[in-house]
């Protein structure tokens, strides 16, 4: 056998070993990632199931009322505060993301803005709560109110929406922007009619995360929206402190109510049942909002695909 044949056989054997090792490594990593995904899915199912089962185990219809043991007022306050915070944070977050993606030039200013956004997203919510208390309560001379709470939650939500908007626009193919500009459209028209609609599904992901932050927030609201809730459901005068839609009244949310029942509810024999039921309702509320927003995202994506 010639030296050339030996080299060819050795090369084939080496190549076969490399292929076998690559396939083995691929199977191992596939198994690891599959197990990790399966584990997280099972963990989420078990956690959600546990919260829902324990929450509805001692269910009492009175829990859904506006009575002392009911959470109707807290449920309304939670939804109302999240809506207020999204009204503030969504336009600002999308606008900031568009500026970073399309208008800001690479340099120190852009780096500073990105570092500031990252720092803001990592701040503990208790710090935002104290900031909100100093600025929105003490400096304005107002009492605890839902509007101050929504401003605090908006500060926590802004980095999420800004980052997702910036990432969504930057990830779009360049042909979207170039094709629109080639037809004579301005940059503003391109952003409004081309880039934002195409990036909307991913932007809604940021909105979902922002809403989830609002639904579950407690520390920031402890110093801004307050722990008292006095609502008169027959009073719809917006200037009245008992009107449900008055944003300048104090309003305890579900997350705060859970904390109060767990820490200061020793005088209420139903405190544990109320806290677990409130937790279950909060989970259902967050899941419902996520599902609705996801369906909106899917419809927008299908509409964009049909239009293209």
Task: Give names to the regions the model predicted.
Residues 63-69, 221-281:
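Interhelical loop and adjacent transmembrane-helix boundary motif
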Residues 96-107, 114, 143-195, 202-210, ...:
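Membrane-cytosol interface at the C-terminal ends of specific transmembrane alpha-helices
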Residues 76, 80-88, 92, 96, ...:
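Hydrophobic alpha-helical transmembrane segments of multipass integral membrane proteins
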Residues 10, 104, 166, 170, ...:
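C-terminal transmembrane helix and the adjacent membrane-cytosol boundary/short C-terminal tail
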Residues 118-156:
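Generic hydrophobic transmembrane alpha-helix motif, especially the helices
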Residues 12-35, 50-87, 106, 260-272:
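Periplasmic/extracellular loop-to-transmembrane helix junction in inner-membrane transport proteins
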Residues 85-117, 130, 138, 293-302:
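Transmembrane-helix boundary motif in ABC transporter permease subunits
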Residues 1-36, 294-308:
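Transmembrane alpha-helical segments of polytopic membrane transport and secretion proteins
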């Amino acid at each position: 056998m010639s030296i050339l044949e030996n080299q060819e056989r050795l090369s084939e054997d080496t190549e076969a070993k490399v292929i076998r090792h690559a396939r083995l490594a691929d199977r191992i990593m596939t198994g690891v990632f599959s197990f990790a995904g399966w584990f997280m899915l099972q963990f989420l199912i078990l956690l959600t199931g546990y919260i829902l089962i324990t929450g509805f185990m001692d269910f009492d219809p009175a829990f859904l009322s506006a009575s002392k043991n009911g959470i109707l007022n807290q449920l309304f306050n939670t939804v109302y505060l999240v809506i207020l915070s999204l009204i503030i944070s969504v336009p600002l977050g999308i606008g900031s993301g568009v500026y970073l993606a399309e208008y800001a030039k690479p340099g120190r200013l852009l780096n500073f803005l990105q570092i500031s956004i990252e720092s803001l997203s990592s701040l503990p919510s208790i710090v935002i709560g104290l900031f909100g208390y100093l600025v929105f309560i003490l400096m304005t001379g107002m009492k605890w109110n839902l509007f101050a709470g929504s401003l605090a939650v908006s500060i926590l939500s802004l980095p999420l929406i800004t980052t997702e908007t910036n990432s969504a626009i930057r990830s779009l193919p360049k042909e979207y922007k170039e094709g629109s500009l080639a037809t004579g459209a301005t940059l503003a028209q391109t952003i409004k009619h081309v880039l934002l609609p195409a990036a909307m599904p991913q932007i809604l992901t940021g909105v979902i995360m922002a809403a989830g932050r609002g639904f579950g927030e407690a520390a920031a609201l402890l110093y801004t929206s307050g722990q008292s809730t006095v609502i008169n459901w027959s009073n719809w005068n917006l200037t009245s402190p008992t009107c449900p839609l008055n944003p300048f009244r104090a309003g305890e949310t579900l997350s705060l109510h859970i904390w109060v029942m767990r820490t200061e509810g020793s005088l209420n024999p139903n405190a544990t049942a109320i806290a677990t039921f409130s937790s279950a309702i909060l989970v259902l509320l967050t899941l419902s909002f996520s599902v609705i927003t996801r369906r909106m995202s899917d419809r927008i994506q299908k509409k964009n695909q049909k239009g293209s």
